Amino acid sequence: MGSKRPDRRGFIKSGAALAGGLTFGAAAPAIGQDQEHHGPSMIKEGKDQIAYGDRSKHVTSVRIAHGGRPSPDNWGLTFHIAAPLQDSVGVITPSSLHYIGTTRGSFLPDIDPKEHRLMIHGLVDRPLTFTMDDLKRLPSVTRLHFIECAGNRSSRRAKNVQETHGMTSCAEWTGVLLSTLLKECGLKGSATWFVAEGSEEVKGASSMPIAKAMEDCLIAYGMNGEAVRPQQGFPLRLMVPGFEGIFHTKWLRRIKVVDRYYINYNDFGHLDQDAKVAALDYQIGPKSVITFPSAGQQLPGKGFYEISGLAWSGGGAIKLVEISTDGGKRWNKAEIKGTAQRMAHARFGLMWNWDGKETELLSRCTDEIGQIQPSREQIAKYWNKPYDQTFSVPGLDNSIQPWKIASDGSVTNGFA
């Protein structure tokens, strides 16, 4: 079966990690007083490093172009860029590694925050225009939220978790609730939808229900303790917690309140959809993925490991994560690290004693409203499609991702 699940208390009592229980080798002995020990070489810091810190040269995690398009391309357009989930720790994605999503491709706007304005108009009593200073004078909130691109799905060609699931990230966002601004403007009785527009060349815009705006949408000017990065929408980004990434409008400049579903570029593809597809086009379903061990990684030998990964859902907080170490025959409850936040990544882990045999790892999650992450077989049944056609189903794909572990410790995509 490829594994034994250790008792947590027994694992600690056995002192496996300190007594050579990790069969690929015990920790090196401490250096004795009679042994010569040389400290590390010193880094000579310059003014740039003092002004804004660098990471260590030994840390090499980088984003990669996603979906087969070079980015930037020969014209300088940026397309999809995936985050290195395989190297992530905790739940917050560093701003410099946060994924980038743009279906059409975009040039990066160079916006002077002193000149930037946010206009709110349409079916409101008082159309208003806000400067950045105006927004920062209003009551602020700080919340942890993920964003995920609708194209974040596995394929048989994907070689690692960055290629299968790298189009999601989680950050701490600070700003003003959209409901605060809409209350200031005053909504007319016929207001049922709103349209958010960005400042990029094609004026990216999306239509959303006004109920969502009044619930938890955030006009963010801060990200991970500093200003929102230009690639993430500086100086303003609309955060729509739990909705697919295309609704999180970057370089936000205008919100129009309307009384019907508004036709624009981003929403045009939704017009022909039946209810079954449309239901999957806003809220992200429960989803999880094991980031270690995952495809492209190598286990050095049998013994104890902590299986680790991320889970998230547009339906709220993650309440349960389960892991199978035998291809789905049995499921074990994983530990959720810390307190899971609503519409945010949750880090999970499970101690595992690998016996060195070939096996398959899976994870699945359940959110606070009871939604359970489906298998690919369940996806096929839902769409009434053959299994082989489920990799291109409409809407969002939140199916379980398998990782195969060979007897030599190599890890590969279970769909390959």
Report residues per predicted region.
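N-terminal secretory signal peptides
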Residues: 1-10, 20, 24, 31-33
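Sec-dependent signal peptide hydrophobic core
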Residues: 15-19
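Structured, non-membrane catalytic/scaffold regions adjacent to prosthetic-group chemistry
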Residues: 33-416
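Generic cytosolic/nucleocytoplasmic N-terminal low-complexity/intrinsically disordered segments
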Residues: 3, 12, 43-46
